Curated annotation (Swiss-Prot):
Belongs to the UPF0270 family. This is UPF0270 protein YE3952. Gene3D superfamilies: YehU-like. Pfam families: UPF0270. HAMAP family: UPF0270.
Amino acid sequence: MIIPWQQVDSETLDNLLEAFVLREGTDYGEHERSLEQKVEDVRRQLVSGEAVLVWSELHETINIMPRGAFRAGAEELP
């Protein structure tokens, strides 16, 4: 189920974004980006609708994923 990011408390959203970025461990190539920059990148994706907050009833977890992956039914993958 998609959770509208606008309805999430700002501090909670900040914590979700930071936890997501730290968990992903994405390699940005030659130029390392700060945690704050990575968090803002993900925030922009949420605002633009490219990414969505998803609640998994199966796993009782919240995740951030590309909108297209959610539509493809990937929200219940481990």
